[in-house]
């Protein structure tokens, strides 16, 4: 029995869909959506949905640097009954997380991974909308701004996907699929897209 725990509905959805594509029955649990699969031994969930009374064989806890978040950080400190736990985080969280493990009297092994693609900063200012290219992700901070920018791009004939927190789950899934498949050229999103979500963003 396994469980994936992440900070975002979008991440839980991504893992759920990858499991299903691999032929693994998977249940998805988030604050707004529950999808139960028959004979499922795997759960993909937002971290707050963890049932601490359940026992698991293996667990993946993602984006554990969120432990420093003043509103949600406590959710990454709850105990999970599991002999093998994989905790994914940025290096900044390593000291805090390993200290908690030691307080519990448990052991750990650290594995570090390097980013496969280099992050490159643009040297010149970005001119919107003239310099928008296929594969771009435009990040804004409100739903209103997402819809405004997407509307401006669509009026110029640029097919656009939109992602923001309150988007209904089925529509959100469709928007992600369309961008991943190249059916839309650009994605406009709130900053939630930046936390672990795997999309074919070029810039």
Model-derived features: positions:
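Helicase motor core with emphasis on the C-terminal RecA-like subdomain
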Residues: 1-2, 6, 10-43, 48-60, ...
């Amino acid at each position: 029995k396994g469980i994936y725990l992440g900070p975002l509905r979008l991440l839980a959805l991504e893992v759920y869909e990858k499991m299903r594509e691999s032929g693994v029955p998977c249940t998805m649990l988030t604050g707004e959506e529950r999808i139960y699969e028959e004979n499922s031994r795997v759960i993909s969930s937002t971290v707050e949905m963890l049932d601490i009374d359940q026992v698991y064989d293996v667990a993946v806890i993602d984006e554990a640097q969120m432990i420093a978040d003043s509103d949600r950080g406590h959710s990454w400190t709850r105990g999970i009954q599991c002999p093998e736990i994989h905790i994914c985080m940025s290096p900044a969280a390593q000291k805090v997380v390993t200290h908690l493990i030691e307080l519990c009297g448990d052991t750990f092994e650290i594995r570090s991974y390097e980013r496969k693609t280099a992050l490159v900063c643009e040297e010149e200012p970005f001119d919107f909308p003239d310099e928008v290219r296929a594969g771009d992700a435009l990040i804004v901070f409100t739903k209103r701004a997402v819809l405004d920018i997407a509307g401006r791009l669509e009026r110029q004939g640029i097919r656009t996907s939109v992602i923001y927190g309150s988007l209904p789950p089925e529509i959100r899934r469709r928007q992600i699929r369309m961008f991943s498949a190249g059916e839309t050229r650009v994605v406009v999103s709130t900053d939630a897209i930046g936390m672990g979500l795997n999309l074919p963003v070029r810039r």
